[in-house]
């Protein structure tokens, strides 16, 4: 069992656990110290603003009648199971992708927990410029964003290597087939 954790992407589950714990700790701190819709200015462009999000990212489908709670929960659970399976399958040599998926998993589980326990996601990080406010978000959303950014970086970083490898394999295959034809 320990070998499974040492030799696969499961070795990065501590990142998921840390993201989940930080997310829940921050949300409970907000619940205990702020009232709903209260806003506390931290910097000239950043507030803590306690809100409930019944939808998905950017409050998508927030007023859809309640079915979205279970829909987004189901999606997050399925994605989490797929990520766990993928982490188990990933070899020790891979680093960036398992780390990215570990961040996404921790964030997904943080928001799933909110939906199951509260019926909504607790958001409180509020960035703004003048009167334009970016939609409020939380630590779980940040973990998902970090994971997605790492996936994109890996795609550009390792996509070139894979293209080169595929090109080399293709050339080798062409050379072998032309030798066979002669």
UniProtKB/Swiss-Prot annotation:
**Residue ranges under compositional bias (Polar residues)?**
173-182
Q: Does the keyword Metal-binding apply?
A: no
Q: Which GO terms describe its biological process?
A: proteolysis
Give the residues annotated as active site.
Answer: 123, 141
Catalytic activity, EC? 3.4.23.36
User: Which transformation does this protein catalyse, written as a reaction?
Assistant: Release of signal peptides from bacterial membrane prolipoproteins. Hydrolyzes -Xaa-Yaa-Zaa-|-(S,diacylglyceryl)Cys-, in which Xaa is hydrophobic (preferably Leu), and Yaa (Ala or Ser) and Zaa (Gly or Ala) have small, neutral side chains
Regions crossing the membrane: 12-32, 40-60, 70-90, 97-117, 136-156
What are the alphabetically sorted keywords of the record? Aspartyl protease, Cell inner membrane, Cell membrane, Hydrolase, Membrane, Protease, Transmembrane, Transmembrane helix
Task: Please name the GO terms that the record assigns under molecular function.
Answer: aspartic-type endopeptidase activity
One Pfam family name from the record? Answer: Peptidase_A8
Q: Where in the cell is it found?
A: Cell inner membrane
Record's GO cellular component terms: plasma membrane
Q: What is the membrane topology here?
A: Multi-pass membrane protein
Tell me the pathway. Answer: Protein modification; lipoprotein biosynthesis (signal peptide cleavage)
Coiled-coil region: none
Q: What does this chain do?
A: This protein specifically catalyzes the removal of signal peptides from prolipoproteins.
Q: Mind telling me which HAMAP family this protein's record contains?
A: LspA
* Family per record: Belongs to the peptidase A8 family.
Q: List the protein's name.
A: Lipoprotein signal peptidase
This protein's gene is called lspA
